[in-house]
């Protein structure tokens, strides 16, 4: 396991996930009867600040269709949570027009790099080009001064 499990935090994430699914109208319980579904969902709603009750509720009442989805959602949340702690693993998003993204993507594949590596490479190339241009301009002025 790459990321440490935080039981209380993950119970809260599970609670948030299940309540959101319930509010979207999905049956989060293993029961077919609507009144029983509502009662069990209300029971889960009331156990928000009690991680052990949330885990017990999940063990006893969770719909058979949800365990895999729930585990995937928690695994993704755990990854984002731990990656967000360190600056070098923290993800940022930028808005790109589709045409720009497409060109960048093609260039990345051609260079066999990730998008981030390609952007860094392009910035480095531009900076070295600017530095070269400055050196050339300085050499031209010194040559002109020398020839006077």
Swiss-Prot record:
The keyword Oxidoreductase does not apply. GO terms for cellular component: cytoplasm. Keywords: Cell cycle, Cell division, Cytoplasm, DNA-binding. It is found in: Cytoplasm. The keyword Nucleotide-binding does not apply. GO terms for molecular function: sequence-specific DNA binding. InterPro entries: Arc_rbn_hlx_hlx, MatP, MatP_C, MatP_N, MatP_N_sf. HAMAP family: MatP. Required for spatial organization of the terminus region of the chromosome (Ter macrodomain) during the cell cycle. Prevents early segregation of duplicated Ter macrodomains during cell division. Binds specifically to matS, which is a 13 bp signature motif repeated within the Ter macrodomain. Belongs to the MatP family. Homodimer. This is Macrodomain Ter protein. It comes from Haemophilus influenzae (strain 86-028NP). The lineage of its organism: Bacteria, Pseudomonadati, Pseudomonadota, Gammaproteobacteria, Pasteurellales. The gene is matP.
């Amino acid at each position: 396991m790459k990321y440490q499990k935080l039981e209380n935090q993950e119970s809260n994430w599970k609670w948030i996930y299940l309540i959101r699914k319930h509010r979207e109208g999905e049956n989060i319980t293993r029961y077919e009867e609507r009144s029983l579904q509502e009662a069990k969902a209300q029971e889960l709603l009331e156990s928000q600040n009690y991680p052990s009750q949330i885990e017990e509720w999940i063990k006893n009442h969770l719909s058979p269709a949800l365990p895999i989805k729930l585990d995937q959602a928690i695994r993704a949340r755990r990854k984002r949570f731990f990656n967000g702690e360190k600056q070098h693993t923290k993800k940022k998003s930028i808005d790109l027009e589709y045409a720009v993204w497409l060109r960048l993507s093609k260039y990345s594949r051609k260079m066999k790099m990730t998008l981030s590596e390609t952007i860094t490479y392009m910035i480095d190339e531009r900076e070295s080009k600017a530095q070269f241009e400055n050196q050339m301009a300085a050499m031209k002025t010194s040559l002109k001064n020398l020839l006077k």
